[in-house]
Amino acid sequence: MNKKRLLIKLHWFYTLELNQVDLYMAQSKIFKNQDKKLGLFFERIALIEQNHVDNIAKKIRELGGNPTRLGDIVAPNLGKIAGNTMGLSGLKIALKANRLLESKAISDYELLIKDLEKDNSHPELIKVLEHNLVDEHLHTAWFEQELNILNKQKQKKRL
């Protein structure tokens, strides 16, 4: 993969991850009023996503690029708006939307890793992307677990 194409892909991830940081921080603030533990989980996920932002920004710079200024401005605002909107729509809707967003990130990470492995290039970048991918899977599993808990609680109320 040529450098220009790789930088475009890394900028996509940079913007996506920036969006997720503010999305999950907004949700953390909303849901911690319902349940402190829930707020802490969203906050922790946001901090992990911030680590992804930092790692991707570092790789962009190592390749001679600069993290996109548009991403720095637009993604956080979109993340806050989406986080607040989804949070106000309720926990179940937020969890489902988050799961969908994480699934997109997983799919995109897998494709980029596959492309880089095919080229047999950028082993350090592949490792960073693989670590991010593991985190995205963990986030998805947590969202799924919380959805299952909500569904079980709903079923108990029916009985």
Stretches found by the model and what they are:
Residues 1-159:
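Iron-associated oxidoreductase/ferritin-like identity signal
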